[in-house]
Swiss-Prot record:
GO terms for cellular component: cytoplasm. InterPro entries: Leucine_aapep/pepB (IPR011356), Macro_dom-like (IPR043472), Peptidase_M17_C (IPR000819), Peptidase_M17_leu_NH2_pept (IPR023042), Peptidase_M17_N (IPR008283). CDD domains: Peptidase_M17. Its cofactor is Mn(2+). It catalyses: Release of an N-terminal amino acid, Xaa-|-Yaa-, in which Xaa is preferably Leu, but may be other amino acids including Pro although not Arg or Lys, and Yaa may be Pro. Amino acid amides and methyl esters are also readily hydrolyzed, but rates on arylamides are exceedingly low; Release of an N-terminal amino acid, preferentially leucine, but not glutamic or aspartic acids. It is found in: Cytoplasm. The lineage of its organism: Bacteria, Pseudomonadati, Pseudomonadota, Betaproteobacteria, Burkholderiales. This is Probable cytosol aminopeptidase. Binds 2 manganese ions per subunit. The keyword Manganese applies. Belongs to the peptidase M17 family.
Length: 503
């Protein structure tokens, strides 16, 4: 799909050349009980009051998300007009804009429209310019058009008819909007990869499949990749990671993918993604109901790989390293048992009180490995705890960090990207829950503050660099009728790196 930007000053009224541009449809926003303004006013004048008449007739009332097509329109270059309700102007917000854009795309995708002129990006969204509107609209469209049909014998209907979108923006925002469009496409491509990886079944998306995906990203975008196999992992003495992997016939992989967009000496940001391609719980077996969704336990890894793809396509001037420890967590005669004690790469011994708390066991060795890159910051991403879902539900990703500056950057990025996160505590007092009578620490700390103690466990292996942990257990996928991976937190991570790169 092709996206282009055109500066447009609606204050010029019907003299604006934008109105005569050929298009199958022009998208206009109308507020509830409000005098027409901007693009809607100009097109109303060009069509001799058509927009005003349909509003007066009650065909559309401007309520948020309502749509109405006007056909065989004369006086402008577009043959059709799509009116989109925006709700009350005094209540118009970023969310309302997103809802309006979504409604517009859904209406358009149900037609044979090929080329669209989209004017909503110039709407008065508080604290936002048209470049933000362009990015949000493209991401909304790509979300609407995403389909996962790879595993069906007869895939659903093909690509939508819509092929080209021209965004009108304020002339002063023209350059920024072009950058925003490019970044939005790259971001959507990264999110689609993340969603595809998450939606694939565990018998397809194995550790080897993730490794091959990383190799493809490296080949397509000129990145460096190293995939360490069993013997290399053993040589590194990653006993914690290997203790999880040994219960499965699928061989573990340790993926290191490097993007260099800045000077060689510039310290990289390291992203660590949990890659449990299927989590049965191990000997501490999960309940059978809903266990199919444990294919999503590699969404941390998927989001890190998706972010790397997006960053490479954007060409950001920043160095980034992705580390993905990946394996299955399965019950077997040689699998971890409750009470086993394993030795991590760092040398700390860990009492495995619950084999279903395996994510932290593979991440801790990856966090130790990350030290060799002398990172500017390390961010790990994991579907780590059900406790985080209890605390935050499915809206906010859980953010943990002792570094206030890094946490602030990530929260700012989450707000800018519309990919919300909420900071949770990481006080030293919680560490007491991880005490073991027989090892340096236990892998669980009991039911109270389960997401916090999981982060506390990881913090013991991330003491030598600025570090943050993102618990995406509640945000990486949806259940129910809309079951599927969300692509989060690729927008948050990408925006963080955009900000770091000064792009």
């Amino acid at each position: 799909m092709d996206f282009s930007i055109k500066g447009c000053d609606w204050s010029k009224g019907t003299a604006n050349g934008f109105l005569t541009g050929k298009s199958d449809c022009i998208v206009l926003g109308v507020f509830e009980a409000q005098t027409l303004s901007g693009a809607a006013l100009d097109i109303d004048e060009a069509t001799k009051g058509l927009v005003s008449r349909v509003i007066k007739a009650g065909d559309i009332d401007g309520k948020l998300g309502k749509t109405l097509f006007l056909h065989e329109v004369s006086g402008i270059g577009a043959s059709r007009v799509l009116l989109v309700g925006l709700g009350r102007q005094d209540a118009f917000s970023q969310k309302a804009y997103g809802d309006a854009a979504k409604a517009a795309w859904r209406a358009l995708l149900g037609t044979k429209v090929v080329q669209v002129t989209f004017t909503l990006a110039q709407l008065p969204v508080p604290e936002r310019a048209s470049d933000w509107g362009v990015r949000a609209a493209i991401l909304a469209l790509r979300n609407e058009t995403y389909k996962f049909t790879q595993m069906k014998s007869k895939p659903d209907a093909g690509a939508p008819a819509l092929k080209r979108v021209v965004f009108s923006v304020d002339p002063a925002d023209d350059k920024a909007a072009k950058v925003a469009a490019k970044q939005a496409v790259a971001l959507a491509n990264g999110m689609d990869l993340t969603r595809d990886l998450g939606n694939l079944p565990g018998n397809v998306c194995t550790p080897t499949y993730l490794a091959n995906t990383a190799k493809k990203i490296a080949k397509d975008w000129g990145l460096k990749v190293d995939v360490l196999g069993l013997k290399q992992i053993q040589a590194l003495k990653m006993g914690s990671f290997l203790s999880v992997a040994k219960g499965s016939v699928e061989p573990p992989q340790f993926i290191v993918l490097q993007y260099r967009g800045a000077a060689a000496k510039a310290a990289p940001v390291v992203l660590v993604g949990k890659g449990i391609t299927f989590d049965s719980g191990g000997i501490s077996l999960k309940p059978g109901e809903g266990m199919d969704e444990m294919k999503y336990d590699m969404c941390g890894a998927g989001s890190v790989l998706g972010t790397m793809r997006a960053v490479a396509e954007m060409g950001l001037k920043v160095n980034v390293v992705a580390i993905v420890p990946t394996c299955e967590n399965m019950p077997a005669g040689n699998a971890n048992k409750p009470g086993d004690i394993v030795t991590s790469m760092k040398g700390l011994t860990i009492e495995v009180l619950n084999t279903d708390a395996e994510g932290r066991l593979i991440l801790c060795d990856a966090l130790t490995y990350a030290e060799r890159f002398k990172p500017a910051a390390v961010i790990d991403v994991a579907t780590l705890t059900g406790a985080c879902i209890i605390a935050l539900g499915h809206h906010n990703t859980g953010l943990f960090s002792k570094d206030d500056a890094l946490a602030g950057e990530l929260l700012d990025a989450s707000r800018e990207a519309g990919d919300p996160a909420w900071r949770l505590p990481l006080d030293d007092e919680y560490q007491d829950q991880l005490k073991s009578n027989f090892a340096d620490l236990a892998n669980i700390g009991g039911r109270p503050a389960g997401s916090v103690t999981a982060a506390c466990f990881l913090s013991r292996f991330a003491e030598n660099y600025p570090w943050a942990h993102l618990d995406i257990a509640g945000t990486a996928w949806k259940s129910g009728a809309a079951k599927g991976a969300t692509g989060r937190p690729v927008p948050l991570l990408a925006q963080f790196l955009i900000d770091r790169a000064g792009a």
